[in-house]
Amino acid sequence: MITTQKKKKNRFLPDFDKQSIYSLRYEEMQDWLVEHGQQKFRAKQIFQWLYEKRVDSIDEMTNLSKDLREVLKDNFTMTTLETVVKQESRDGTIKFLFELQDGYTIETVLMRHEYGNSVCVTTQVGCRIGCTFCASTLGGLKRNLEAGEIVSQVLTVQKVLDATDERVSQIVIMGIGEPFENYDEMMDFLKIVNYDNGLNIGARHITVSTSGIIPRIYDFAEEDIQINFAVSLHAANDEIRSKLMPINRAYSIDKLMEAIQYYQEKTNRRITFEYGLFGGVNDQLTHARELAHLIQNLNCHVNLIPVNHVPERNYVKTPKEDIFKFEKELKRLGINATIRREQGSDIDAACGQLRAKERQVETR
């Protein structure tokens, strides 16, 4: 028996009266329709209204019968995100502060590149991982987002882009929260945005980043979906990584590397390691050599990230010349490495700066 309300998969999910229609995968919509005496092909029509025509209400789905629309309204809600603040950076990056149905707030970022528009989505209200350089974890974890709330972030940004005939071409799951701590909803989200009948964003244009939740890395290796995979590493030894990322005390670097090796053997896909450079902490050439030794046998890429200022944190940015030296040393040792282009730091939209808290800023 298919029910309209999915079983709650963890205690951190909200308990809303109705499920978001955006949380349903295509096959779940088909099953629901059959259960309610409808034909499966209606699922394609509904998904077209949701993701191609991007309507704001079920009543606008005019090729569905009135009775079906009423049943849909009785069972589902169309998740809407209220834009509380919208800020635009000098480089064109746009940060959205969205209010959720229960009053919590999250942040989502639109980044513009030569190759297209990328959206950085949030998967949790807050975060409990506790990285000592990150703003997202300052208030702790409030709750997980439903798949529909993650989908709605992309849809809301896409509706903004519709005004200029642009589209979201890439998604990075690197906003507030640890995606692998909201694994089932994240996977539903990935499938929904990847469907031909959904937002139709290619799997290879989607990247998920984790701080290193080892059991979920093994799970992710078994998924039949070619999503890009990134790991926030930031140090190549347990002493420094545990100071930067307390999660390392539970999942040591040795265990993390075992899981990553398994993922690579299973999927034959390249891994991206994200390495934030913190002045005087992990940015010396000895650290570069240590990193190169750790990952030398992996098919991987290192994304070097200049640390961004967070008022509550005491880390300082590594000087540019030292960042270039670090990159050069990695390349000398045979490691593919690039320096991430900094975007949105003037509106606190860059790596490590997102938080689920409204600020007194001008809406632009």
UniProtKB/Swiss-Prot annotation:
Binding locations of [4Fe-4S] cluster: 127, 131, 134
PROSITE patterns per the UniProt record, alphabetical: RADICAL_SAM
Record: residues binding S-adenosyl-L-methionine: 177-178, 209, 232-234, 308
Enzyme class at the top of the EC tree: transferase
A Pfam family recorded for this sequence: Radical_SAM
Subcellular compartments: Cytoplasm
Catalysed reactions, semicolon-separated: adenosine(2503) in 23S rRNA + 2 reduced [2Fe-2S]-[ferredoxin] + 2 S-adenosyl-L-methionine = 2-methyladenosine(2503) in 23S rRNA + 5'-deoxyadenosine + L-methionine + 2 oxidized [2Fe-2S]-[ferredoxin] + S-adenosyl-L-homocysteine; adenosine(37) in tRNA + 2 reduced [2Fe-2S]-[ferredoxin] + 2 S-adenosyl-L-methionine = 2-methyladenosine(37) in tRNA + 5'-deoxyadenosine + L-methionine + 2 oxidized [2Fe-2S]-[ferredoxin] + S-adenosyl-L-homocysteine
Disulfide bonds: 120-351
Annotated Gene Ontology cellular component terms: cytoplasm
UniProt keyword terms in alphabetical order: 4Fe-4S, Antibiotic resistance, Cytoplasm, Disulfide bond, Iron, Iron-sulfur, Metal-binding, Methyltransferase, rRNA processing, S-adenosyl-L-methionine, Transferase, tRNA processing
Primary location recorded for the protein, binned into one broad class: cytoplasm
EC annotation from Swiss-Prot or TrEMBL: 2.1.1.192
Domain Radical SAM core: 113-346
Gene3D superfamilies noted in UniProt: 1.10.150.530, Aldolase class I
Cofactor(s) listed: [4Fe-4S] cluster
Catalytic center residues: 107 (proton acceptor), 351 (s-methylcysteine intermediate)
Xref: InterPro entries: Aldolase_TIM (IPR013785), Methyltransferase_A (IPR040072), RlmN_N (IPR048641), RNA_MTrfase_RlmN (IPR027492), rRNA_lsu_MTrfase_RlmN/Cfr (IPR004383), rSAM (IPR007197)
Note: Reaction proceeds by a ping-pong mechanism involving intermediate methylation of a conserved cysteine residue.
Name of this protein: Probable dual-specificity RNA methyltransferase RlmN
Organism: Staphylococcus carnosus (strain TM300)
Gene from which the chain derives: rlmN
